[in-house]
UniProtKB/Swiss-Prot annotation:
Protein name: Putative rho GDP-dissociation inhibitor 1
The organism of origin for this protein: Dictyostelium discoideum (Social amoeba)
Alphabetical list of Pfam families matching this protein: Rho_GDI (PF02115)
InterPro entries: Ig_E-set (IPR014756), Rho_GDI (IPR000406), RhoGDI_dom_sf (IPR024792)
Molecular function as annotated in GO: GTPase activator activity; Rho GDP-dissociation inhibitor activity; small GTPase binding
UniProt keyword annotations, A-Z: Cell cycle, Cell division, Cytoplasm, GTPase activation
One Gene Ontology term, aspect cellular component: pathogen-containing vacuole
Expression induction or repression: Down-regulated in the absence of cap.
Keyword Cell division on entry: yes
Subunit structure: Interacts with rac1A, rac1B, rac1C, racB, raCC and RacE.
Functional note: Regulates the GDP/GTP exchange reaction of the Rho proteins by inhibiting the dissociation of GDP from them, and the subsequent binding of GTP to them. Regulates the Rac-dependent signaling pathways controlling cytokinesis, actin reorganization and the contractile vacuole. Required for efficient accumulation of cap at the cell cortex.
Family listed: Belongs to the Rho GDI family.
Statement: the UniProt record of this protein carries the keyword Ubl conjugation: no
Main localisation: cytoplasm
Length: 197
């Protein structure tokens, strides 16, 4: 929950390139052996995904890291676990330092310009919206991980007005404005780790 709420006026206009599939990339310049090896190092040798799962983005887990505390890990492999996340809030002590790590797989095709939009609500009123560019990712067997903030820690708000229960919704979209996943979660900001305020 940083203070850069919805500020995009200083961001230059970004125009995404035309979408090119993994198969199209592999077929371009197929006769060039050096380029073929380079592409395989970037894209892998095959598409890693179950044939019965059409999703391009599969979030595996969301990890809340709080400085000096054990991590809180939410597995998000299934729709049931994603729905359950909203009913299991995590606690932030006011002024604590935290960061959030997402672990995910990309399957079937390249996801270009993956973005995360996190909107936080308190008592139904929007408090903040933050957008993070995560990057472009090719399908691979190993999971990708992205941590926000990438450097340092985020500081939780403090003071009597900041304390309370919050809900949030994080939406993952790409350059083609395809919505890959929407997850709702809840958290509380308290004066100490065990208080009921």
């Amino acid at each position: 929950m940083s203070d850069n709420h919805e500020e995009e006026s200083n961001v230059p206009a970004y125009v995404p390139g035309k979408h090119v599939s993994v198969d199209q990339l592999k077929q371009q310049d197929a006769e060039d052996e050096a380029l073929k090896r380079y592409k395989e190092s970037l894209l892998g040798t095959g598409v890693h995904a179950p044939k019965d799962d059409p999703r391009k983005l599969v979030i595996k887990e969301m990890k809340i890291q709080i400085e000096g505390r054990p991590d809180t890990i939410y597995p998000l492999d299934t729709k049931e676990l994603i729905k359950e996340m909203k009913t299991k809030p995590f606690v932030l002590k006011e002024s604590c330092h935290y960061k959030i790590t997402l672990t995910f797989n990309i399957q079937h095709d390249i996801v270009s310009g993956l973005k995360q939009t996190n909107t936080v609500y308190r008592k139904g009123i929007k408090v903040s919206t933050e957008k993070h560019m995560l990057g472009s990712f090719a399908p691979q067997a190993l999971a990708h991980s992205v941590t926000n903030p990438r450097h340092g820690w985020e500081e939780a708000p403090s003071g009597m007005l900041a304390r309370g229960s919050y809900t949030a919704k994080v939406v993952f979209t790409d350059d083609d404005n395809e919505e890959h996943l929407s997850v709702e979660y809840a958290f509380s900001i308290k004066s100490d780790w065990k208080s009921d305020d």
